[in-house]
Amino acid sequence: MRDLVVRGASETEIKLAADEIRGKLNPHPAGQMELNVPKLDGEVVAGMQHKYQETVLFFPSQGQTCHRYCTFCFRWAQFVGDKDLKMASTDAEKLHGYLQEHTEVTDLLVTGGDPMVMKTKNLVQYLEPLLQPEFDHIQTIRIGTKALTFWPYRFVTDKDADELIELFAKLVDA
C-alpha cells in the first residue's frame, strides 16, 4: 500500500489493493456467520448471534456506523460495504420472538457499529417491549457504545436526548 501511495497510484488502484488485502482477513472467526446464527421457526434470524448460552448479540441496522473508527475494532466487517460480511437487522419482532422462545437467555448485547448513533425511537422499538412480563428472564441489557467518549452530547443536548434518558430510566427501574 505504501508503494502505491508513494508512486501516486490512482484511487481505484489503491482501493483494489486494499480490497485484496481485506479479502485475506477473516472478519468472522470461529464460524460466527454459520455456528452462532440463531433460528426462529426454522428460519435464520438475520442480525443476531446467540454466541453464549445466556447471551444474544443484536446488530440493529440503524447502528452500523460509529462516531469514530477505532484501529483496534474487531467489527470492521460491518463497515467495509460488503453486505455478505455485515450482520444487521431491522426486525424487532424477530428479536423479541427469539428471546421469548429462549428463556435461557438472560443478557442482550445491542452492538454494531455503535447503537448510540441510532435515534431514540429506534432503540425504543427494540428495548421497550423487553419490559413486558414475557421477558422477565432478560436480566441485563448492554449497549456496546463509545458515545460517552466520542459524542457525549448524545445524552445531554441531541434532539432526542431527553427521550433517551427516559428510556434508560424505564429500563433501570424495571
Across the structure, where does each feature detected by a protein language model lie?
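Flexible, acidic/Gly-rich N-terminal and inter-domain linker regions that tether
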Residues: 1-51
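N-terminal pre-triad scaffold of radical SAM enzymes
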Residues: 41-74
